[in-house]
A protein has these predicted regions:
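Active-site/catalytic core of tyrosine-dependent DNA strand-transfer enzymes
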Residues: 1-12, 91, 95-111, 115, ...
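Basic, Lys/Arg- and aromatic-enriched nucleic-acid-binding interface segment
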Residues: 20, 96-147, 263-265
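Short, charged phosphate-coordinating catalytic segments
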Residues: 34-39, 133-165, 277-284
Length: 332
């Protein structure tokens, strides 16, 4: 009815579809983040994944809305200041200060475990799981990968020279979602520490460590999972190994970082959005591209090296959070 009256006053014959197409084209032309674009287009979080993973201040959404109306010669209704406060979207985004405190407490606990007296220090099996957990944490906050079985694949899925890792964390619409994403400086250092540890482990000749030794050899050759847990029996002895799964990650993290399994995806995307990173880079990292608009599709002029814009931002973020590499401590 409103559109019909507007057409009558202006002598036009615009349809709702035409208005929607214009809005979509304007948002794309202006390079508006896909989360904000989804909100302005009236989509639900189930229809627009970036909305679900982004913590967006209301004032930012309203600012874009006013720009859009101004492009058509219109003005928005002035809202009371309190109505522009707060945020929409993800509720799993801790602020930088809160996350830094949480990670600080976790790393303080980790250092205490590793620097205590010989009687208090972890066994090799316990150390192994501490190292796997820390490696996962750093890779999570670098790649924003979805929690899946055999997390981060195998050794051949990444290259420390080119600083890229291949993620295969979701298959949908009969089209592979495999993608190359850049590794942050901290992720490269942690993977180097993990490889050194695997090499150390593969050289062990203690019969009781045979399951770990075998898994390390498989990981180094690329024939087995890169990351795996050590499973302890009730008496504390090594029982075997277990590949990394979403459920096993929850068990290992819940006592120290009691957050949802995919909290890191919310945190990474929200931080990149806050820092003004282009939406095409963010969506390429999280695997949120729409079909036909992929970052590296055949009609794109983008280069993979452009994605290092992401690591420039993430490296500074990791420094602010106080994240450190684990793997340089003496193994007992």
């Amino acid at each position: 009815d409103c559109l019909a009256r507007a057409n009558e006053r202006a002598g036009t014959a615009l349809t709702m579809r035409q208005l929607q197409n214009y809005q979509r084209a304007w948002l794309q032309r202006e390079g508006i983040d896909s989360a904000i674009a989804g909100i302005l287009r009236g989509k639900a979080a189930q229809q627009c994944s970036p909305m679900a993973y982004s913590h967006v201040p209301r004032k930012d959404v309203l600012q874009i809305w006013r720009r859009y109306l101004a492009s058509m010669g219109m003005t928005a209704v002035v809202l009371a200041p309190e109505l522009e406060q707060g945020a929409v979207g993800s509720r799993l985004y801790p602020s930088v200060g809160e996350l830094a405190r949480l990670l600080g407490n976790y790393q303080q606990y980790l250092c205490a475990r590793l620097s205590g007296s010989r009687q208090q220090r972890p066994t090799l099996t316990q150390y192994h799981n501490l190292l796997v957990r820390h490696s996962l944490l750093i890779l999570h906050l670098s790649t924003a990968a979805r929690p899946v079985t055999e997390m981060y694949g195998r050794r051949g899925d990444y290259c420390l020279i080119s600083r890229f890792i291949r993620l295969t964390d979701k298959e949908g619409r009969s089209v592979s979602s495999a993608r190359l994403v850049p590794l942050s400086a901290l992720a490269v250092q942690q993977l180097q520490a993990w490889e050194r540890y695997l090499t150390y482990l593969a050289c062990q000749r203690e019969p009781l460590l045979a399951p770990l030794v075998s898994a390390a050899e498989q990981a180094l050759s690329g024939a087995g999972a890169l990351l795996f847990w050590a499973v302890e029996a009730k008496d504390g002895s090594l029982e075997g190994t277990e590949i990394v799964t979403p459920n096993s990650m929850m068990r290992q993290f819940e006592n120290l970082l009691p957050l949802a399994p995919n909290w890191h995806r919310h945190s990474v995307r929200s931080h990149l959005l806050e820092q003004g990173v282009a939406t095409e880079f963010i969506d390429a990292l999280l695997g949120h591209e729409e079909m036909g608009t992929e970052f590296t599709n055949q009609y794109s002029s983008a280069a993979l090296s452009d994605l290092f814009t992401l690591t420039d931002v993430l490296d500074k973020w990791h420094q602010t959070l106080g994240l450190k590499v684990m793997g340089e401590w003496t193994i007992h």
